């Protein structure tokens, strides 16, 4: 990395005095923060004890005094919280400021979503703001990153979030479909220098130009999918003005948009010409930029969801719909996907059908399990879902070591008084897994791809 080139860009973006503060902060250790899941975190999890403080722009955000081993915390695996940089949570605050009164299903696309921090943040805001009346499409074009995204969405437990894997251009087949689009675009990563040594090594002025061009292509490709009057949130984790304000100005002039960044300033957050910029030394977290564009024409996003046709009924085994309807607190539409029962909220089934017909879908609805001899063999995703009815399965509270043994995919044995059959396991009152209790032993149903690999 050419330090003088980087320093010059930093001064252009923040001014000389702030740039010096940021340069000193980049020599320090990165902070660690988590965001609580309001669907599951009824009380503060144990890991929050001794926190440095709350995140000013996120009531569910907590800055930790040190970085613990999240892998060895059952609450992490059950979706009680998500590990996310506090600066990244600022995008969620901007998103919340944009939400108007919805009429119909509010349709939102997180275009570059992996590993899922902003998706889960928006899901919490949409659930609070819209109830059941929203669809959040969480997309990741890189197939090798889709698995962790789908796992994190499953842990979060909201059935109104679906995961897709498509190039931004694929969404042009859905003209005007989305009310809001978040583009957390790939960037030069200057804001991640404290966490990513590879980003430091790869940084150059030439790479900034390449990133800038790629970001413009992404914006242009997805733009047709945004409805007239819809809102696009543009964000990066970098500092330089070319990838930030420069691209927002380009989009405004080229794509037909107006800059519509809401007023949501906080101490330490720099208001730029088009948006907001955060940097270490000025705030506890890492680097983040965020701005909002409104597509010229039509009504404002969040005011009216576009109409979609009803989906065709999917084939399903006899009795499956009745069985699954009894399991959820929402009204499910049941389908059979290669032998696995999927339950999707009826309120957004039409919108889900449009997406699944158009782009490659990794997961949609709740993966419930399969039927064997008329009985459901539950999938772990069903147990993790926050809208599974209480006591839908026998539940057993376990100690920490039993939870870790399950997550390590070791054999476990439950107390003799526990009924045989499928049992949901809980840690501090939150479900994290499921076993088939055979009496003298249990069949561990934790997916192999999610198991803890390190020694416990």
What are these regions (language model features)?
Residues 103-114:
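Conserved class I S-adenosyl-L-methionine
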Residues 58-97, 443-447:
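Class I SAM-dependent transferase core
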Residues 1-41, 45-46, 286-289, 296-456:
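Polybasic, low-complexity RNA-engagement segments
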Residues 141-176, 183:
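S-adenosyl-L-methionine
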Residues 144, 179-221, 233, 237-245, ...:
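Mobile active-site "lid"/loop adjacent to the S-adenosyl-L-methionine
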Residues 135-140:
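Conserved SAM-binding motif I beta-strand of class I
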Residues 131, 226-228:
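Helix-to-beta-strand junctions that scaffold the AdoMet/dcAdoMet cofactor pocket
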Residues 115-131:
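Conserved SAM-binding loop of SAM-dependent methyltransferases across substrates and taxa
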């Amino acid at each position: 990395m050419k330090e003088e080139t980087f320093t010059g860009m930093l001064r252009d973006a923040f001014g000389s005095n702030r740039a010096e503060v940021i340069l000193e902060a980049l020599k320090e250790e990165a902070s660690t923060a988590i965001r609580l899941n309001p669907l599951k975190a009824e009380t503060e999890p144990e890991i929050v004890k001794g926190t440095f403080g709350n995140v000013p722009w996120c009531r569910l955000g907590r800055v930790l005094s040190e970085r613990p081993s999240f892998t060895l915390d059952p609450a992490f695996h059950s979706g009680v919280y998500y590990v996310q940089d506090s600066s990244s949570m600022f995008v969620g605050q901007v998103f919340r400021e944009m939400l108007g009164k919805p009429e119909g299903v509010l349709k939102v696309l997180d275009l570059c979503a992996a590993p899922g921090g902003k998706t889960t943040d928006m899901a919490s805001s949409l659930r609070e703001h819209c109830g059941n009346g929203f669809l959040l499409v969480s997309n990741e074009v890189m197939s090798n990153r889709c698995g962790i995204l789908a796992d994190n969405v499953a842990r979060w437990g909201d059935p109104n979030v679906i995961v897709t894997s498509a190039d931004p251009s694929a969404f042009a087949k859905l003209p005007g479909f989305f009310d809001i689009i978040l583009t957390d675009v790939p960037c030069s990563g200057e804001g991640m220098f404290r966490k990513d040594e590879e980003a430091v090594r790869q940084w150059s002025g030439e790479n900034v130009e390449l990133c800038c061009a790629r970001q413009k292509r992404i914006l242009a490709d997805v733009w047709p999918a945004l409805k007239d009057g819809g809102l696009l949130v543009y964000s990066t984790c970098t500092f330089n003005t070319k990838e930030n304000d420069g691209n927002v100005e380009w989009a405004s002039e080229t794509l037909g948009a107006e800059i519509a960044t809401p007023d949501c300033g906080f101490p330490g957050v720099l208001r730029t010409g088009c948006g907001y910029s955060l940097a270490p030394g000025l705030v506890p977290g890492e680097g983040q930029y965020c701005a909002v564009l409104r597509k010229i024409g039509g009504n404002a996003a969040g005011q009216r969801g576009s109409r979609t046709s009803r989906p065709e009924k999917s084939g399903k085994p006899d009795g499956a719909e009745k069985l699954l309807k009894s399991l959820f607190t929402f009204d499910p539409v049941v389908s059979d996907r290669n032998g696995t029962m999927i339950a999707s909220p009826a309120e957004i089934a039409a919108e889900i059908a449009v997406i699944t017909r158009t782009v490659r879908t990794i997961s949609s609805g709740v993966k419930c399990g399969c039927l064997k001899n008329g009985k459901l063999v539950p999938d772990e995703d069903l147990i993790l879902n926050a809208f599974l009815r209480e006591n839908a399965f026998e539940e057993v509270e376990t100690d920490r070591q039993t939870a870790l043994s399950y997550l390590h995919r070791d054999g476990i044995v439950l107390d003799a008084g526990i009924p045989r059959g499928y049992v949901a396991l809980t840690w501090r009152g939150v479900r994290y897994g499921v076993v088939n209790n055979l009496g003298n032993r249990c069949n561990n149903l934790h997916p192999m791809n999610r198991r803890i690999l390190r020694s416990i």
